[in-house]
């Protein structure tokens, strides 16, 4: 989708319906800059090209595997995005993904609508 962040690999019938700049908490000491993409099937994260070269990972989850969408309070971890409230995704396998995004409440509403969770 751009020079800074590569276009996500999509299925043949898949289209991006929404996207937003985001930082993904990849570990307790690292947040990776990039972009969140929403399709009618999945939520995906693509790291920016610099973070991808230095070990930043892409991520994806089918919408049906997102069990919860909420706000994670700041935890004080400066290098993993923990100085701000973050988007929290609880997944069906019990894992948690955290993302720093602007307009957090709007993002939560958008993803809740897409996953069929109460807005």
Predicted regions and their residues:
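Short aromatic-glycine motifs in intrinsically disordered, low-complexity regions
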Residues: 47-60
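Phosphoinositide-dependent membrane-docking surfaces
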Residues: 43, 58-75
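Structural motif
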Residues: 35, 42-44, 65, 95-96
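Anionic N-terminal interaction surfaces
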Residues: 1-41, 57-59, 80-83, 90-92, ...
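Short acidic, glycine-rich loop/turn motifs
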Residues: 47-49, 89-93
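Short acidic, Gly/Pro-enriched loop/turn segments at secondary-structure junctions
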Residues: 50-53, 68-85
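Eukaryotic short linear interaction motifs
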Residues: 45, 52, 97, 107-108
